[in-house]
Amino acid sequence: TAGFFRAAYRSGALKDTIILSETCEFYGKSGHLDTSMADALLSGGAACVVGYVNNVYTVYSRSMLWATVNRLLAGDTVREAVDFGLNLYGADDIIWYNNQGGRRPHAVASFPVLSGNQDARLRAVQAAADSTQQAA
């Protein structure tokens, strides 16, 4: 629950982290956006939180996660990395499901939601890029 995260990560314990959740209903359900979980993590110091509203197909969320992580490792911002995945797999999981030949999608589409600093980058990747630029 949001209360758990708020209590567990007080005083900036998550300083500058990027949190990617591939769980169902992280940002709410039945099409109703609920940012309480993300807000709790951001109040604990997270730079950016990405998750899904509604129930999400596992393969879609896992594929989006891998695409996002790989782009973050390549130096993209969180927004750029998620956009890369969206371009690859579709704006929501029902688009992805139908493109896979699915015939009976679930009732409400799931899509990624971002909160916090969408321009955040992985610190180690950013530090390496900065040192490369300084050397040049």
Regions found by a protein language model. Give the residues of each.
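Active-site-proximal C-terminal subdomain of hydrolase catalytic domains
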Residues: 18-130
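Mobile, glycine- and charge-enriched loop segments
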Residues: 1-28
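Long, soluble alpha-helical segments
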Residues: 131-135
